[in-house]
Amino acid sequence: MTVHDLGTDTVDGTVDAELVVIGAGPAGIVTALEAAGHGIDVVLVESGEVGYEPSLQDLSAAAAWDPTRHAPMPIAVRRQVGGTSTIWGGRCVPYDPVDFEDRPFVESSSWPVTYDEMAAYFPRACDWLVCGRAMFDASGLPDAPPSIVPGLDDGDVTTSSLERWSLPTDFGTTYLHQLTHVANLRLLTGVTATRIVVPGEHGAADHLEARTLAGGRVTFHASAFVVACGGLESTRLLMSSPGPHGGQLGGESGHLGRWYMAHAEGVIANFRFTTPAERTVFDYELDVDGVYVRRRFAFTEEFQLRHELPNIAGWIANPELPDASHRDGKLSFVYLALESPLGPVFAPDAQRLSLTGVDLPGTPYGGSAVSPLREHLRNIVRQPVSTGRFVADFGTRRVLARNRKAPGFFVHNGHNVYPMQYHGEHLPNPASQVRLSRQVDRLGRPMLDIDLRFTDADVDGVVRAHRHWDDHLRASGVGRLEYLYDDLHEAVDRRLGGGFHQVGTTRMSAMPADGVVDANLAVHGVGNVFVASSSTFVTSGQANSTFMIVAFALRLADHLRGVLRH
């Protein structure tokens, strides 16, 4: 089949299928293609086009949000085939076993599924993401050093945890051929879902209503519907749809739109290692298949539970690029490249803005000192040979690479001093939420008011984690952390924000009173509407969301085969 672009349609129409999947991001594409592979007749509905279209992207805008805590939605998400995978970096990290534990110190942290259930889908998720094998431990790296620095063995603190990196895989380009050549799958673009209709108290959705910017209206009839529009857009669609008992679809328990989570991330300390600088594993490594991986600092589950620590990870990072006091020609060259008119070619907006000093919530960097151009040029002139070699090497591996691209770069520090970047759990909080606004978009859909909140517990968890990391470094005799701020709590709080990882607002639960969807991602009380999104996650963990989104989409597709092929 070919792509059916409905964006210019002005007439009404009806489409019938066994399964309608709403949203062609990673969750929607995986669910649709897997279901089609099971012989199910699938329609995949995408609000955007195959390429980027600004007028459609504007439909993602929120009505109200705190710009000091939340990134603007048009920057945080992408409304097109491929979804936000068209602008992501490619980091692939699964949740940890501790994330699925019902932890007494984490409010409402009970999942209706287990880690082992989800781990069974990790190999297939890796295949879809093209990030190699489902091996997330450095012990499997060939001929690799046993630890980040000599003498830093795993204990309560571990450094053998790995993150994997995809191509990065743009689902819109990687899987477009399959989407357009599978006989029992139709991809419809330029048409935006407006509401799901559940007649009376039947307990099942009858149809989906959708509109085009040109004024056309389309009604989709199916046996089952999968909402895969991204975290907040999936929540918005449920809120805009009437439930079988009145109110909002999935809103009977009062949890819909609540528990909105992101992650806590930033830099408040430097590593100062006392081991030989040339033996520090500061950069990416390659696994047996040539896939880029990177080591992370973490804690064992037992240590986290004993010390009531939120889940968190950390890793060696680069100094902030805009501040030329780093005196590194390579860093200055990258900064100037990102600031140039070609900057948008080299990096997505969120990453580029953050790395060039813009204070963008939900990113680890931003708001640093910005040095004059002449100081960056001085760094480059002072190190012409090493800078030139870097440009040639990284340019080949990143810009010119046709398949697997280098995810990024890290520069060696001869003094063995490196920033420590952290990425930690945002604790569940029912007061952190989104609501429908009175303001509507061009299609008449209510927009969202976003109220993302953090608490002192989020800040305290980050600070305590650093204290424990510092203790471990000192006890191992390999170095220490040097803090960059006198008031660590204020420094952590200043960087708190989100918008890129949208977690929790349609949370899953075993009992209808405790959430929005069940263990199979079906909306409680409406057995044929499912949600495939990070919004169903009960906790945020230390991992970014994409890997687990794909794992849950695979699990959902297997469940749908049983439902629609029984």
Spell out what each predicted region is:
Residues 64, 253-256, 265, 269-446, ...:
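FAD cofactor-binding and catalytic pocket of flavoenzymes
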Residues 25-26, 232, 536:
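Residue-level detector of alpha-helix initiation sites
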